[in-house]
Amino acid sequence: MLNRISVDPRVCVGKPTIRSLRITVDFVLKLLGDGYTADEIVQEYPELEKEDVYQAAKYGAWLASETTSGIV
């Protein structure tokens, strides 16, 4: 369950955020992609918890698993 991911059009232009903290899921995913560990992210951004980072990764995996179709 992704109960820490929020989508609100009034926060970060509707981008998915972590608990409406104005830290976007894509930002956390970029940090992970750059090699940061969950511990390092939480240390740099103390308002986050490790579970926030894990749920951001799960959300990214869920989006990547969605089937898309090309425009015909």
What are these regions (language model features)?
Residues 1-2, 66:
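A broad, low-specificity signal for short, low-complexity segments enriched in glycine/proline
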Residues 2-17:
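Short, Lys/Arg-enriched N-terminal segment that forms or immediately precedes the first helix
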Residues 12, 16, 33-36, 56-64:
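Small-side-chain structural scaffolding
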Residues 24-54:
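Amphipathic, hydrophobic secondary-structure cores in small proteins
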Residues 42-43, 47-72:
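C-terminal structural segments of small proteins and small subunits
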